[in-house]
Amino acid sequence: MVLFSEDHIQETRRRGRIEVICGSMFSGKTEELIRRMKRAKFARQRVEIFKPAIDTRYSEGDVVSHDSNSISSTPIDSSASILLFTSEIDVVGIDEAQFFDSGLIDVCNQLANNGVRVIIAGLDMDFKGIPFGPMPALCAIADEVSKVHAICVKCGQLASFSHRTVKNDKQVLLGETAQYEPLCRECYQRALQEDREKS
């Protein structure tokens, strides 16, 4: 009888991978990113979290969910800056990835190819329902994509769309609860029609 076999020892070599958490506003993307990063920290992995410097809604230096859960982060202006901070890191978290430049795709590939676990959270579509920034390409290169959903504020179904409730056509309008509402496809189409009729 074998009481101990080295064949069953779990391998600890770092394996890089890219995980994307995407969805609409208020779907829990940042919440899930924070959860995964805290689990990695608890496992004594070396972690670093980044967010776009333009996102100062709740805090300049932390990643903060709409529910006020937070984790310390490094605000950066350019995706290339991520590589300056990650030489001794096991897990990299990136929040609000839709606001980064397209160079983020190469940065994430480079990190994963060098054994780093990369966890990305971001909006997959803007308020017009158009794929947002580098998110479509990040979903394409990801090892795992988790699409999370909010609840439609009109009918209670799963919501995939972020409807802007204020009149502003800029693609980037950092939003809080009063500026956006999550809607299902049917309610989103109805809201767009109502918006067109008002203008």
From Swiss-Prot:
It is an enzyme of class 2 (transferase). It is found in: Cytoplasm. GO terms for molecular function: ATP binding; thymidine kinase activity; zinc ion binding. It catalyses: thymidine + ATP = dTMP + ADP + H(+). The active site is at E96 (proton acceptor). Keywords: ATP-binding, Cytoplasm, DNA synthesis, Kinase, Metal-binding, Nucleotide-binding, Transferase, Zinc. This is Thymidine kinase. It comes from Bacteroides fragilis (strain ATCC 25285 / DSM 2151 / CCUG 4856 / JCM 11019 / LMG 10263 / NCTC 9343 / Onslow / VPI 2553 / EN-2).
